[in-house]
UniProtKB/Swiss-Prot annotation:
Binding site residues for ATP: 9-16
Reported function: Catalyzes the transfer of a dimethylallyl group onto the adenine at position 37 in tRNAs that read codons beginning with uridine, leading to the formation of N6-(dimethylallyl)adenosine (i(6)A).
NCBIfam families referenced in this protein's UniProt entry, alphabetically: miaA
Source organism: Desulfitobacterium hafniense (strain Y51)
Name of the protein in question: tRNA dimethylallyltransferase
Family: Belongs to the IPP transferase family.
Biological-process GO terms, alphabetical: tRNA modification
Region Interaction with substrate tRNA, residue ranges: 34-37
EC number: 2.5.1.75
Keywords: ATP-binding, Magnesium, Nucleotide-binding, Transferase, tRNA processing
Cofactor(s) in the UniProt record: Mg(2+)
Length: 314
């Protein structure tokens, strides 16, 4: 069986380029592990690889959904596993590329999700928020999970609803479940290579600042405006992701363009820091520095590792 390769790391570190180069070298196909790139019409703000950047490599879970369609970790787990099996059945190498931490954990660890009930629970708490307000929602979490309530600000309603949902699905406080998932890292199968890309923080931040400027220059604000003109609600989850929510602030006159750029860059840097914290917690990740080691050297190292893995598995 062909190995499974997973490439993770913070935004702007070079995951896409390495994934495509590796796929070209190993006869691989790519599965996106990104929670926003899965949506059609959200291209610039999600840093979705263009057709040219995809390098004639088949990509899965890009442009799979309309912006108004919900997409859960459980759905990702199912669809990504189906893609992995399909790719391996044809003698190709599946390569998962992405920075959404829980998506990646759902593939390599035995996370089990309730097949029914999650959407109805979320709908209940969303309606509760509309009727009772965010303070009341936060109080409900405090009753069930004081630690999570302490950690989450009342304004962070998306995460509060997620915590309440997990409390009901698991029967345990989300803080307890979260802690167990963070600390429990079972050994990877011998056919799985878990690669992390990093760089010095100042280099990552410099790349992020430049990328944010490039996104705005490429039409991020216009892309967001077109989605609103097409009738999509600004409250949709993908439109509340980094980049799109900042463009909305500008479009609705809440901030000037320079202020939008400043907070867009700041929030993206904070997001990258959280991504690094998440992935560095996992001792199974094999790290490569994209600043001190160029792409060719990293690529050669990974090709050698994969060849050795394939020999052992066979």
């Amino acid at each position: 069986m062909k190995p499974l390769i997973i490439i993770v790391g913070p935004t702007a570190v070079g995951k896409t380029a390495l994934g495509v180069a590796l796929a070209q070298a190993l006869q691989g196909e790519i599965i996106s592990g990104d929670s926003v790139q899965v949506y059609r019409k959200l291209d610039i703000g999600s840093a979705k690889p263009t057709l040219a950047e995809q390098g004639n490599i088949p990509h899965y879970l890009l442009d799979a959904l309309e912006p108004a369609e919900p997409f859960t970790v459980a759905q990702f787990q199912t669809l990504a596993n189906q893609a992995i099996q399909d790719i391996q059945s044809r003698g190709k190498v599946p390569i998962v590329v992405g920075g959404t931490g829980l998506y990646i954990r759902s593939l390599i660890d035995p996370f089990q999700f309730a097949e029914h009930g999650s959407e109805s629970i979320r709908s209940f708490w969303t309606a509760f928020l509309s009727e009772q307000g965010k303070e009341a929602l936060h109080q409900e979490l405090a009753k069930r999970d004081p630690l999570s309530a302490q950690r989450l600000h009342p304004n962070d309603t998306v995460r509060i609803i997620r915590a309440l949902e997990m409390c009901q699905l698991t029967g345990k406080p989300f803080s307890e479940t979260r802690g167990n998932q963070d600390l429990n890292y079972p050994p990877l199968p011998p056919s799985t290579l878990y690669v992390g890309l990093t760089a010095p923080r100042e280099i990552i931040y410099e790349r992020i600042n430049r990328r944010c400027e490039q996104m705005v220059a490429a039409g991020l604000i216009e892309e967001t405006h077109n989605l609103i003109k097409e009738g999509y609600s600004p409250k949709l989850k993908p439109l509340q992701s980094i980049g799109y929510r900042h463009a909305l602030l500008y479009l609705y006159g809440k901030v000037t363009l320079p202020e939008m750029m400043r907070i867009f860059q700041r929030d993206t840097r904070h997001f990258a820091k959280r991504q690094l914290t998440w992935f560095r917690r996992d001792p199974r990740v094999v790290w490569y520095d994209t600043y001190s080691g160029n792409l060719t050297n990293i690529l050669e190292s990974l090709i050698g590792t994969c060849s050795g893995m394939e020999s052992r598995v066979e």
